[in-house]
């Protein structure tokens, strides 16, 4: 990642090139974004779900939503990828303990979360990716207290897909997670 002046200077505007989506992630984010309604408090988890604000901007509704991330930023547009955890033009930056007070109190209307694995019973693992133990972070508090949770992911690793005018074509389903 590189220095992004738009993160520290309100006069500096980020461009749509700073936040772009392609391929399968674009399709997943467009579907996930259909759950958004005006004036929602929206939490975004790390990974796949960080693209929801990009689609909200494209659809012209981002300014009618309150995005929140567990690191404490509220009211701006979260960064994506390895820069996730920062936010463009937040209206507030809270101590994460206070942010979680809001989450645990049921303040979130919707949470978009990624996952490592989901089994046939709907149990979700968010803490281990293959042999890498990342921990659950705020997943438990957020998923258990948000009014609605949308899990964002592909259910498969090493799959091969192609975006066509007709939709998504999966040529190799890969390994299911």
List the predicted regions and their residue ranges.
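Conserved phosphate- and dinucleotide-binding cores of soluble alpha/beta proteins
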Residues: 1-13, 81-177
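N-terminal active-site beta-alpha-beta segment that forms phosphate/nucleotide-binding
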Residues: 10-96
């Amino acid at each position: 990642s590189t220095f992004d002046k738009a993160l520290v200077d309100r006069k500096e505007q980020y461009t749509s090139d700073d936040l772009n989506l392609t391929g399968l992630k674009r399709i997943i984010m467009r579907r996930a974004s259909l759950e958004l309604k005006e004036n929602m408090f929206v939490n975004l988890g790390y990974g796949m779900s960080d693209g929801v604000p990009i689609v909200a901007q494209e659809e012209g509704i981002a300014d009618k939503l309150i995005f929140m991330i567990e690191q404490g930023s509220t009211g701006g547009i979260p960064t994506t990828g390895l820069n996730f955890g920062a936010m463009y033009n937040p209206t507030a930056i809270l101590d994460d303990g206070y942010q979680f007070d809001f989450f645990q109190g049921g303040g979130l209307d919707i949470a978009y979360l990624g996952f490592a694995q989901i089994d046939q019973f709907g149990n979700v693992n968010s803490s281990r990716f293959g042999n890498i133990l990342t921990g659950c972070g705020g997943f438990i508090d957020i998923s258990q207290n948000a009014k609605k949770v949308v899990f964002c992911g592909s259910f498969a690793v090493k799959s091969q897909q192609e975006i066509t005018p007709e939709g998504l074509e999966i040529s190799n389903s890969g390994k299911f997670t």
